[in-house]
Amino acid sequence: IDFSSIDVSFISLTKVLLPVKNLLTDDGQIVCLIKPQFEAGREKVGKHGVVRDKAVHEEVIQMVIDYAISIGFEILNLEFSPVKGPEGNIEYLLHLQKHTEGTYENIPFEIKNIVDKAHETL
């Protein structure tokens, strides 16, 4: 498989990234939707399952990125989704590429800037 997209609910991306990675070709890519409401702990999720705190958004994005790097992905890009989730959650698109030489920690963007722009725009 050269490319996969991942959009999961009620489960963390950290539970599905490795199995999907194992199906990819050596330079295969993934675009996955980071949904803060399913990555953050219950204590960080507000009314109606909405996460409004920018710091929590930054935290869960960093957690998913750290995990992706730890299992051998290169981080290509991060953008916020122009469409909010059904309850109003801001979500993020993370573009990954399988990195055959191990981990690759060059992250070409600032998470905080993307989260700030998402909250200003949406």
Predicted feature locations:
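A short acidic, Gly/Pro-enriched loop at the edge of an enzyme's catalytic core
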Residues: 1-3, 15
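Glycine-rich, N-terminal phosphate-binding loop of Rossmann-like dinucleotide-binding domains
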Residues: 8-9, 34
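A short glycine-rich, Lys/Arg-flanked "PGG" loop and its adjoining helix->strand segment in the class I
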Residues: 14-31
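Residue-level signal for inorganic ion chemistry
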Residues: 35, 88
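Short, glycine-/aromatic-enriched active-site segment of Class I SAM-dependent methyltransferases
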Residues: 36-53
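Short alpha-helix
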Residues: 57-71
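Conserved S-adenosyl-L-methionine
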Residues: 72-82
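Flexible, glycine-/basic-rich loop-and-beta segments that form/coincide
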Residues: 89-122
